[in-house]
């Protein structure tokens, strides 16, 4: 988002922004909302029978049978009305429409924001340099799923022809946070529903003791490593990758038979033959959404 409060000048005649981008604290409805701080005593609101009724009322249905429940948040009808007024003044709906239609929403870096296209097509096709981005993301998702299914089925195996049992991700920042959060959130559910496939570990700390501890906890011969770096030049990630490659080599293993890359099509990793495969992402999806 832009840090200023002036209208954004588009970088391309076909990429335009109709909404006005201003900091929230310049909006009158923001001042009204700020004045409602501590308006709701959540401990009282959630107690007794009124708490149960609140849980029923402050819930919104989502896809796949999920419910978003915000009963434990410090809101009531007054606060919700103030939030709606802020959304209107900030042109939230207009900006959301511009986002899914491919406008330059990340005005600081002059980029579109397209992580939503990894899930579905909400608006008009978004085409960049002749490439339909929805089709591109779906193709990469299919490539990743096909690779994972082959690993699970024992079609992609280690040098001894044995199945991989552990996957270790090497990344930093959002590229670590997103996959780690998903794994933590879904691990127990997958085990309870008999869909758990492989144990996952994560290396993100550049302290070699951290990487060494992770490697000591896995059987290297049966471990598959995913190197995640959009640019392919992230120093911390490449440092940890080198550490892992050294450990694999010392164990008598060929690192190229144990590694795959998640990167951009233009990165050095994409052109390397040191990986089993490469899954591509681009500059329009941030690291934490790349999982």
Where are these regions (language model features)?
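Short, intrinsically disordered, charge-balanced linker/junction segments flanking boundaries
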Residues: 13-18, 46, 287-291
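Generic N-terminal initiation segments characterized by hydrophobic and/or small/turn-forming residues
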Residues: 8, 15, 111-114, 266
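Tryptophan-centered motif/residue detector
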Residues: 3-4, 115, 247, 286
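Short, Lys/Arg-enriched N-terminal segments with co-localized hydrophobic residues
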Residues: 1-17
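Polar/charged alpha-helical tracts
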Residues: 15-17, 44, 216, 249
